[in-house]
């Protein structure tokens, strides 16, 4: 069986993680203490992708919860699913990282990281066939960003051939939680480019927009946002956990989605999203799912794919869906929106089907897109970074923890490189390549 070890770091990561385990437990028929009381054998069949079986029909998440301060952990423990987790898997410090990436990556976090890696190692040893790691964290803070990326590189060293998928909450364009967000995010992206296999970019502002525009919530809470994220996270791994006609897993996803190793930052979406009162007024069908799934308003990252082009994308359908209908819809989308897909990757939509829908829905779909427009997100953070770094504002907090200014410069140029790589592939077309071939072939004619 293909197991996944799940890490949640920092406040944001732990809160999303808590919502995710709530979703997953519901899908597999587990109650708040991990006891199975579901109705279908299918729920049990691949329970061990995310859960270890303990004695007495109790299932324990293969999750490692990490934070540099005990607050969030206590909140998770006191939450509705707090009794689910194994107590040894809570690893926390006392000092906190104080939104300082250097503290999370070099000082406070580095002291705690070996403890975390021990727990990860123990979880990995209990697996038959480890598929990879999933990490939830934010890139704007200290622990999730600094220590999260440190963990990723440590795990990379130890398990070089396993998939590393991260769900990273990017800083929002308008809403900022901390002033030093651009620093933390740029330093984190610098790490993710090198060490992660697939990074799903999520952004609070886009989530707020979805909650307000589509779900018609007047003042959405973080709980509502995390619920949206957990729907996508559950969708990405649904093929591992339930049978389907066309399977996908983290590795297949990466192979189909990442045309060039550095360009592994994805936009995600989920359908159907309807406001609570409007459920009874619409029937969900494949065309409707497809339409909503490819709607820019539905993307959970604040960049508009109409400003770029899709290199690749993946659609994961759940429920009783006809294969043919899905393929027709996908072909339809590609032919209607040709300008939004690069023409040098002919069939760039990967589809997967899973026969079991999420709770309370007849069918649903998860969308993952690798679009060049994600560069907007990095550009925005990069501009804010440059503005502050030019004046060396707040830098003493980082150098005081032993960081060097060089590291900032490197991170900045790495992010700028990433942006220009995306731009280069956005502008690339088939014809450029053909002209070169023609030039090479021409001399042959004269030789005859």
From Swiss-Prot:
GO molecular-function terms, A-Z: GTP binding; GTPase activity; metal ion binding; structural constituent of cytoskeleton
CDD domains assigned to the protein according to its UniProt record, in alphabetical order: beta_tubulin (cd02187)
Region annotated Disordered, chain positions: 425-448
Keyword Metal-binding: yes
GO cellular component assignments: cytoplasm; microtubule
Main localization of the protein described in the UniProt heading: cytoplasm
Start-end of Acidic residues biased regions: 432-448
Quaternary assembly: Dimer of alpha and beta chains. A typical microtubule is a hollow water-filled tube with an outer diameter of 25 nm and an inner diameter of 15 nM. Alpha-beta heterodimers associate head-to-tail to form protofilaments running lengthwise along the microtubule wall with the beta-tubulin subunit facing the microtubule plus end conferring a structural polarity. Microtubules usually have 13 protofilaments but different protofilament numbers can be found in some organisms and specialized cells.
Role, per record: Tubulin is the major constituent of microtubules, a cylinder consisting of laterally associated linear protofilaments composed of alpha- and beta-tubulin heterodimers. Microtubules grow by the addition of GTP-tubulin dimers to the microtubule end, where a stabilizing cap forms. Below the cap, tubulin dimers are in GDP-bound state, owing to GTPase activity of alpha-tubulin.
UniProt similarity note: Belongs to the tubulin family.
Protein name: Tubulin beta chain
Source organism of the structure: Aspergillus parasiticus
Gene field: benR
């Amino acid at each position: 069986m293909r197991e996944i070890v799940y890490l949640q770091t920092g406040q944001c990561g732990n809160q999303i993680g808590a919502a995710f385990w709530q979703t997953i437990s519901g899908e597999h028929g587990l109650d708040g203490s991990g006891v199975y009381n579901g109705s279908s054998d299918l729920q049990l069949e691949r329970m061990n992708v995310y859960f270890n079986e303990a004695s007495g029909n109790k299932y324990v998440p293969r999750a490692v919860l990490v934070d540099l301060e005990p607050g969030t952990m206590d909140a998770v423990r006191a939450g509705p699913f707090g009794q689910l987790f194994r107590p040894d898997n809570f690893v926390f410090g006392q000092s906190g990282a104080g939104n300082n990436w250097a503290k999370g990556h070099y000082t406070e976090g580095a002291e705690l990281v070996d403890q975390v890696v021990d727990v990860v190692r123990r979880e990995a040893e209990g697996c038959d066939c480890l598929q990879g790691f999933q990490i939830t964290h934010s890139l704007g803070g200290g622990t999730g960003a600094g220590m999260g990326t440190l963990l990723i590189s440590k795990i990379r060293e130890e398990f070089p051939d396993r998939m590393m998928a991260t769900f990273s909450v990017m800083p929002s364009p308008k809403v900022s939680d901390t002033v030093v967000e651009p620093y933390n995010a740029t330093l984190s992206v610098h790490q993710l480019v090198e060490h992660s296999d697939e990074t799903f970019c999520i952004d609070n502002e886009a989530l707020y927009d979805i909650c307000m525009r589509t779900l018609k919530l007047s003042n959405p809470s973080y709980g509502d946002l995390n619920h949206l994220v957990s729907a996508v996270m559950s969708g990405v791994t649904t093929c591992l956990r339930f049978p389907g006609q066309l399977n996908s897993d983290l590795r297949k996803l990466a192979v189909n989605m990442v045309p060039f190793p550095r360009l592994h930052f994805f936009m995600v979406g989920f359908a159907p999203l309807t406001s609570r009162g409007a459920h009874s007024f619409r029937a969900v069908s494949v065309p409707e799912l497809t339409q909503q799934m490819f709607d820019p308003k539905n993307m959970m990252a604040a960049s508009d794919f109409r400003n770029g082009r899709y290199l690749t994308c993946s659609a994961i359908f759940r429920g009783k869906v006809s294969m043919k209908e899905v393929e027709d819809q996908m072909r339809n989308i590609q032919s209607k929106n040709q300008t939004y897909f690069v023409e040098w990757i002919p069939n760039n939509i990967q589809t997967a089907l899973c026969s079991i829908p999420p709770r309370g829905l007849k069918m649903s779909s998860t969308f993952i897109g690798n679009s060049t427009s994600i560069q907007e997100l990095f550009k925005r953070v990069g501009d804010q970074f440059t503005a502050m770094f030019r004046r060396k504002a707040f830098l003493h907090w980082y150098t005081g923890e032993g960081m060097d200014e060089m590291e900032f410069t490197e991170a900045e140029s790495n992010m700028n490189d990433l942006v220009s790589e995306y731009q280069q592939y956005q502008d690339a077309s088939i014809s450029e390549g053909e002209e070169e071939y023609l030039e090479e072939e021409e001399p042959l004619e004269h030789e005859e």
